[in-house]
Amino acid sequence: MFSMVTEFMNYSQQTVRAARYIGQGFMITLSHASRLPVTIQYPYEKLITSERFRGRIHFEFDKCIACEVCVRVCPIDLPVVDWKLEKDIRKKRLLNYSIDFGICIFCGNCVEYCPTNCLSMTEEYELSTYDRHELNYNQIALGRLPMSIINDYTTRTILNLPMK
């Protein structure tokens, strides 16, 4: 008889403990119900990126001196710089510059260490394609500035997300 009472007491303690855990989880769920939604309807609404966002790299051909610092500081030796030495003026002339964004890790080292500031990060992050070879941008594609999200009339921009 005594063992039956202790088993019943253990069972009731376990039931109370389980109900308390369920109640704690339910209270957390209820606290989230009063918050504003964090998700956005992506193709129709876009977040404005922060000032230091590391998106697609923009390249200015006229500023580049073909020093290849960007290649040396890149952890994966990604930028391809083709140049020709002009013997009469003893300077390099840039022929081709390309970056494959299918491989790029967007670390920003090339932008940070460029001595002439011919590289900069843009706010463009929509680089998806069906063919990975389309992600290999030459100097012409890198020179195009992306369309600003703020000026895009087809989408609604959201300035900032609600804080927790």
UniProtKB/Swiss-Prot annotation:
Cofactor: [4Fe-4S] cluster
InterPro entries referenced in this protein's UniProt entry, alphabetically: 4Fe4S_Fe-S-bd, 4Fe4S_Fe_S_CS, NADH_quinone_OxRdtase_chainI, NDHI
Residues holding [4Fe-4S] cluster 1: 64, 67, 70, 114
Mode of membrane association: Peripheral membrane protein
Highest taxon, organism lineage: Eukaryota
Example GO molecular function: iron ion binding
Catalytic activities: a plastoquinone + NADH + (n+1) H(+)(in) = a plastoquinol + NAD(+) + n H(+)(out); a plastoquinone + NADPH + (n+1) H(+)(in) = a plastoquinol + NADP(+) + n H(+)(out)
EC class of the enzyme, as a word: translocase
Main location: plastid
Keywords: 4Fe-4S, Chloroplast, Iron, Iron-sulfur, Membrane, Metal-binding, NAD, NADP, Plastid, Plastoquinone, Quinone, Repeat, Thylakoid, Translocase
SUPFAM superfamilies listed in its UniProt record: 4Fe-4S ferredoxins
Domain 4Fe-4S ferredoxin-type, chain residue ranges per copy: 55-84, 95-124
Binding locations of [4Fe-4S] cluster 2: 74, 104, 107, 110
Single GO biological process annotation from the record: photosynthesis, light reaction
Subcellular location: Plastid, Chloroplast thylakoid membrane
Record note on quaternary structure: NDH is composed of at least 16 different subunits, 5 of which are encoded in the nucleus.
Function in brief: NDH shuttles electrons from NAD(P)H:plastoquinone, via FMN and iron-sulfur (Fe-S) centers, to quinones in the photosynthetic chain and possibly in a chloroplast respiratory chain. The immediate electron acceptor for the enzyme in this species is believed to be plastoquinone. Couples the redox reaction to proton translocation, and thus conserves the redox energy in a proton gradient.
Family: Belongs to the complex I 23 kDa subunit family.
Name of protein: NAD(P)H-quinone oxidoreductase subunit I, chloroplastic
Organism lineage string: Eukaryota, Viridiplantae, Streptophyta, Embryophyta, Tracheophyta
UniProt gene name: ndhI
